[in-house]
């Protein structure tokens, strides 16, 4: 019986409610599933046929350790999903710059690995500053530029790489769109709406989610983004905003995204079928 480990983290060592929906389908297809904490040194990862990253939601707090763990799966019989190459590239949000250069419409962004002058931000009322390695709005802040001094800006981005973006009020009005792809094919979408007075779209900050049906044009645009970002992805989630009928990419999640299976009837089966397909290749 083939064995698959779902990589989790210490604060949620068992499977998430979403991932539990996958287990009976995997079992029906002859697979054994077990949750394993990604940084548990006692785990023998290579006894598994495959490891699927699902809820390693503290990886950005231990980024060097996480990158080292991912690299262990290079050139091994144990398949990692997504692949080490895909994951290593996706951990640092400067991948957006590469996608921008390939013609993808990305939210206007300053990619800061060095000093940014306050004068460069003139004409923008509010900005969002976020770390290039992060998740779940970790250390993401909104600033009014008229109240922002060079000293405050320098202090905020003094270490590491950061993204600076104009704050787009449309996220409060229209919500953020998430389009999920499984095995490279479109599966389903949701709209995430922040609570009144907030901009963050995570449920822990009071956001609400609902099913969303994108048109074919948007699906094709998102699929093109996935194809430009990486090949042979088991899962990918394209997050962005629609502004004046243009889709602007915020990020593409290919490490440990919530795939929102509760908003789709076919998603869990599609996920399992894509896994089986990739494991055979």
Give the predicted meaning of each segment.
Residues 11, 57-58, 134, 169-170, ...:
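Short, solvent-exposed loop/turn segments at secondary-structure junctions
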Residues 2-8, 70-77, 83-174, 216-219:
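Active-site nucleotide/adenylate-binding loops and adjacent lid/helix of ATP-dependent enzymes
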Residues 48-53, 130, 178-181, 246-258:
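A short beta-strand motif that forms the metal-chelation/ATP-contact edge
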Residues 216-281:
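ATP-dependent carboxylate activation and anion-phosphoryl transfer catalytic cores
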Residues 44-49, 120-124, 243-248:
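A short, glycine/Asx- and small/polar-enriched loop/turn
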Residues 144-226, 230, 241, 248:
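Phosphate-binding site of ATP-dependent enzymes
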Residues 10-108:
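Conserved N-proximal alpha/beta basic substrate-recognition cap immediately N-terminal to
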């Amino acid at each position: 019986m083939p064995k698959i480990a779902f990589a989790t983290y210490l604060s949620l060592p068992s499977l998430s409610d979403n991932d539990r929906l996958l287990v009976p389908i995997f079992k029906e297809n002859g697979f054994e599933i077990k949750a394993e904490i990604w940084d548990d040194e006692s785990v023998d990862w290579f006894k598994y046929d495959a490891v699927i990253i699902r809820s390693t939601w503290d990886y950005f707090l231990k980024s060097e350790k996480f990158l080292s763990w991912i690299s262990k799966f290079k050139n091994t019989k144990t398949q990692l999903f997504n692949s080490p190459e895909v994951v290593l590239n996706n951990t640092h949000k400067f991948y957006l710059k590469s996608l921008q250069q390939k013609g993808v419409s990305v939210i206007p962004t300053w990619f800061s690995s060095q000093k940014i002058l306050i004068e460069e931000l003139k004409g923008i009322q509010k900005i969002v500053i976020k770390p290039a390695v992060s998740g779940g709005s970790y250390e993401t802040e909104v600033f009014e530029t008229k109240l922002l001094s060079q000293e405050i800006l320098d202090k905020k981005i003094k270490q590491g790489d950061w993204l600076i973006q104009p704050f787009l009020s449309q996220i409060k009005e229209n919500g953020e769109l998430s389009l999920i792809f499984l095995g490279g094919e479109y599966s389903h979408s949701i709209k995430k709406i922040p609570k009144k007075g907030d901009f963050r779209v995570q449920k822990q900050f009071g956001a609400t989610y609902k099913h969303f049906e994108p048109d074919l044009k948007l699906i094709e645009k998102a699929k093109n983004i996935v194809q430009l970002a990486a090949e042979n992805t088991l899962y990918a989630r394209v997050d962005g905003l629609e502004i004046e009928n243009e889709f602007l990419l915020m990020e593409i999640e290919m490490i440990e995204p919530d795939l929102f299976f509760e908003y789709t009837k076919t998603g869990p089966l599609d996920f399992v079928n894509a896994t089986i397909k990739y494991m055979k290749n």
